[in-house]
């Protein structure tokens, strides 16, 4: 039996592997990630609560493919050009500031006056009746401001989290520190999801705020409809400003001493070698290693998109109005945050003790098990119902889907993100910076958009199709892509080991 002092040191090493001298850098980085993930959790629920109750869960496939993906491509081109001309710090302020400005404009100007900007329902219904195969595109046009909010909310994840924050972290930490810092950063940051869920539940369940349905219900006044949205957006903007303030503190006061692993002079010399846009794209395409990282992201995005569509359709059946939808998603965020923090504690030890390969494989394994269970439940829901009697099968289906979503995303945030970020570290600064820009933004959205393409193509060809009617085909695609993901991880691990040596 270990002496008490050694035992507690071992426990501390498992739960909190950060040394005291590193707290000066760790604390502001963790708080910055908490603010960014708070916004992610809140925006994720808001974007779904706007589009799903008003246009249907099937519309998500069209939004991801026809709007989100092109927006990501345009942003990547813009980012590569900016990275050749501006300091990373100014790029960060410009991008985050643009997001926050749009959210304010939407909540306080666009949304309250949506009746002025949106076409009337009679005209939309006539267009759908005349062009049934284009009904989903017509629905997007009818609520174009919701679609725009959806795009910006999606880009917050791809741009601010995956690209801006993690690129900054990769510049600061080497591989050894990343193994200790990244899981704990994620653990602290995911508390933001719990806070976001609590905020959403508070503003969607308080009867003193509003007594009836809000946001997307046209028979409510615009002022009442905005009562829930505006304070949430205000908190989101405040969190974004705090994140920028912390970013400034880190750059100005902390990265000037020995804690900064990055050699500033060396970086300045390297970044003088600029590539033209076409050359940058060629560099990314011809890098087999970057291609494998991109495939990781594509597989995850496609698989989670395939599962989320049917799940959100079931949520709409149970919660057809936006208040209940936001309230459910708020509770979902709380449990997601709790699960993520738990997985972060476990994941930090898996990564340090079992290595990169095992840590990277656990996410697809978790997603395959929980995803397969969800599909089987939906496909055989009637047969299952005969065994369990008078249970509310719709509610059970949603809970099964929620468990799948929570567990798979918890393993993704704790292990997938950390192992993916570690895979960038052995690369040169040029390839790491510009390769990551394309992989993170385009790769993230291409995976989801590929799943969206498959689904939207079916919905265009067969306007009467629903997620329930195509669920068996989605299961087949799910199994094929899961095997490809696992094979790619094994191949990437071999190249990662070579680069680290």
Swiss-Prot record:
This is ADP,ATP carrier protein 3. It is a multi-pass membrane protein. Keywords: ATP-binding, Cell membrane, Membrane, Nucleotide-binding, Transmembrane, Transmembrane helix, Transport. GO terms for cellular component: plasma membrane. Provides the rickettsial cell with host ATP in exchange for rickettsial ADP. This is an obligate exchange system. This energy acquiring activity is an important component of rickettsial parasitism. GO terms for molecular function: ATP binding; ATP:ADP antiporter activity. Belongs to the ADP/ATP translocase tlc family. It is found in: Cell membrane. PANTHER family: ADP,ATP CARRIER PROTEIN 1 (PTHR31187:SF1), PTHR31187. Pfam families: TLC. It comes from Rickettsia prowazekii (strain Madrid E). The chain crosses the membrane at residues 23-43, 59-79, 90-110, 146-166, 183-203, 227-247, 293-313, 326-346, 361-381, 383-403, 446-466, 470-490. InterPro entries: ADP_ATP_car_bac_type. The keyword Iron does not apply.
């Amino acid at each position: 039996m270990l002496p008490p002092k050694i035992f507690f040191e071992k426990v501390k090493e498992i739960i909190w592997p950060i040394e005291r001298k590193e707290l000066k850098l760790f604390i502001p980085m963790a708080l910055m990630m908490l603010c960014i993930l708070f916004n992610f959790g809140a925006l994720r629920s808001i974007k779904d609560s706007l589009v799903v109750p008003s246009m249907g869960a099937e519309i998500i496939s069209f939004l991801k493919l026809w709007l989100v993906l092109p927006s990501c491509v345009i942003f990547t081109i813009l980012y590569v050009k900016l990275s050749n001309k501006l300091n990373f710090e100014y790029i960060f302020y410009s991008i985050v500031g643009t997001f926050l400005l749009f959210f304010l404009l939407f909540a306080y100007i666009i949304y309250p006056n949506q009746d002025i900007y949106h076409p009337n329902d009679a005209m939309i219904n006539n267009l759908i009746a005349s062009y049934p195969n284009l009904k989903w595109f017509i629905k997007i046009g009818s609520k174009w401001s919701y679609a725009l909010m959806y795009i910006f909310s999606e880009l917050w994840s791809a741009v601010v989290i995956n690209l801006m924050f993690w690129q900054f972290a990769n510049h600061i930490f080497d591989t050894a520190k990343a193994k200790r810092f990244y899981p704990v950063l994620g653990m602290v940051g995911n508390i933001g999801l719990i806070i976001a869920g609590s905020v959403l539940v508070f503003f969607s369940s308080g009867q003193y705020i509003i007594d009836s349905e809000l946001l997307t219900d046209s028979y409510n006044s615009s002022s009442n409809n905005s009562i829930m949205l505006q304070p949430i957006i205000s908190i989101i903007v405040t969190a974004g400003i705090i994140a920028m303030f912390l970013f400034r503190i880190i750059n100005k006061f902390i990265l000037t001493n020995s804690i900064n692993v990055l050699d500033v002079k060396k970086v300045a010399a390297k970044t003088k070698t600029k590539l033209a846009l076409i050359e940058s794209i060629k560099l990314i395409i011809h890098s087999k290693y970057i291609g494998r990282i991109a495939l990781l992201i594509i597989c995850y995005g496609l698989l989670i998109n395939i599962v989320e569509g049917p799940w959100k359709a079931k949520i709409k059946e149970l919660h057809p109005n936006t208040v209940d939808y936001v309230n459910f998603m708020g509770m979902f965020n709380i449990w997601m945050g709790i699960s993520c923090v738990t997985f972060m504690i476990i994941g930090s030890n898996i990564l340090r003790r079992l290595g990169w390969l095992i840590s990277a494989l656990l996410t697809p394994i978790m997603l395959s098990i929980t995803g397969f269970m969800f599909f089987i439940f939906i496909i055989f829901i009637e047969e299952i119902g005969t065994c369990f009697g008078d249970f509310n099968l719709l509610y059970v289906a949603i809970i099964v889907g929620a468990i799948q979503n929570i567990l798979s995303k918890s393993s993704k945030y704790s292990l997938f993100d950390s192992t993916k970020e570690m895979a960038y570290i052995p690369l040169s600064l040029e390839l790491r910076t510009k390769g990551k820009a394309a992989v993170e933004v385009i790769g993230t959205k291409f995976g989801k958009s590929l799943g969206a393409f498959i689904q939207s193509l079916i919905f265009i060809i067969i306007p009467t199709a629903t997620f329930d009617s195509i669920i068996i085909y989605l299961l087949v695609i799910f199994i094929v892509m899961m095997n490809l993901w696992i094979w790619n991880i094994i191949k990437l691990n071999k190249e990662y080991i070579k680069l680290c040596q």
